[in-house]
Amino acid sequence: METAVELLKKSSAMLEGHFLLSSGKHSNQYFQCARLLQHPQMAEKVFENVVKKIKEDIKTGKLKVDIVTGPAMGGIIAAWEVARQLSLSAIFTERDENGIMSLRRGFEIHERQNVLIVEDVVTTGKSSMECAKVLTEKGAAISGLACVVDRRTDDAQSIQWPFYPAVKLAANNWDAQACELCKQGIPAVKPGSRKI
């Protein structure tokens, strides 16, 4: 079975350069998981072990999941694939015209529903936290977080729920003023979808 890293490389989802991340940090590496998730067979494979662990935790009573949600854009296909493997429904949150994460398109969350949030990449967890805020304000309980790539650094905010990454990959993250690539005069590109 191919590993998550092999799938990321095979799909050309691991990019090298100077990137401005959605978190506002700079990095020499970017994970464009859409390149992997566009292939249904690869999406299935990258989440197989994640879903296996989730199912084990559900079976032992450590986790309860009623619905799967992902923050747009990166979490839409990821959440759908995990939900498919769990035989659950998948919905997504997205930013409204004011840039506020919200539940739209007629999607509903019911009080006391147990929600698994799924993302493509977790760097700071900001999108996951924004998604969780929307859901908990509607009375849902966040039961866990899953992702393709966990690229958090040691100083990142800790994840407060059970966490199921397909792979943990260390990548350099810098604040803009400390960015080694900026100091070298290399222009940054912003491939993500969130407006900073």
Where are these regions (language model features)?
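Active-site-facing substrate-recognition patch
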Residues: 1-58, 195-196
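PRPP-dependent phosphoribosyltransferase catalytic core
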Residues: 1-7, 132-196
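Short, glycine/charge-rich flexible loops or terminal/linker lids adjacent to PRPP-binding catalytic cores
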Residues: 73, 78-116, 126-129, 181
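Active-site-proximal mixed secondary-structure blocks
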Residues: 123
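Conserved acidic residues
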Residues: 66, 113, 143
